[in-house]
């Protein structure tokens, strides 16, 4: 099992994200998210990653939502939005994405995920439910409940 590290909100993390901009999927860049966090000077970073040697090979953001969407989670006061999970191509098929999902589940809170880039089946395989709804960008909305 890999060590999942919280990534600090700083320019070093921006440099680590550079490989994802060069080789990753354009829809998953997280440039605006990181820059927004740096501007807000938020103390709690929502970014997590798995390093392979000194390279960031997989990453995601876990955003806590205080205002629960009653339509999805009527029995919970809070939930996590799993945002833009991505593994660089040369590190795929090593279980890193599954480890990030398990890490998100370890918070024992409901999780809402957006199925981008044909990832719907991946989330379904990990116990998420398809609510047969789309977000404003047209991507599938999937849920996991503890």
UniProtKB/Swiss-Prot annotation:
Keywords: Acyltransferase, Transferase
InterPro entries: Acyl_CoA_acyltransferase (IPR016181), GNAT_dom (IPR000182), YlbP (IPR017274)
A GO molecular-function descriptor: acyltransferase activity, transferring groups other than amino-acyl groups
Signal peptide (from-to): none
EC number per UniProt: 2.3.1.-
Coiled coil (UniProt feature): none
Source taxon at top rank: Bacteria
Domain N-acetyltransferase, residue spans: 7-146
HAMAP family given in the database record: Acetyltransf_YlbP
Name this protein carries in UniProt: Uncharacterized N-acetyltransferase SAB1040c
Organism: Staphylococcus aureus (strain bovine RF122 / ET3-1)
Taxon lineage: Bacteria, Bacillati, Bacillota, Bacilli, Bacillales
């Amino acid at each position: 099992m890999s060590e999942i590290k919280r990534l600090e909100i700083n320019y070093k993390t921006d440099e680590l994200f550079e490989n994802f901009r060069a080789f990753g999927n354009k829809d998953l860049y997280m440039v605006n998210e990181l820059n927004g966090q740096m501007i807000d000077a938020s103390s709690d970073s929502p970014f997590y990653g798995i390093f392979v040697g000194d390279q960031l090979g997989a990453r995601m953001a876990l955003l806590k939502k205080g205002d629960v969407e009653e339509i999805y989670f009527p029995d919970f006061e809070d939930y996590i939005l799993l945002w833009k999970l991505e593994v660089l191509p040369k590190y795929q098929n090593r279980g890193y994405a599954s480890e990030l999902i398990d890490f998100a589940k370890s918070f024992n809170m409901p999780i809402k995920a957006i199925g981008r880039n044909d990832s719907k089946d991946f989330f379904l395989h990990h116990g998420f439910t398809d609510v047969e709804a789309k977000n404003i960008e047209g991507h599938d909305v999937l849920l996991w409940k503890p």
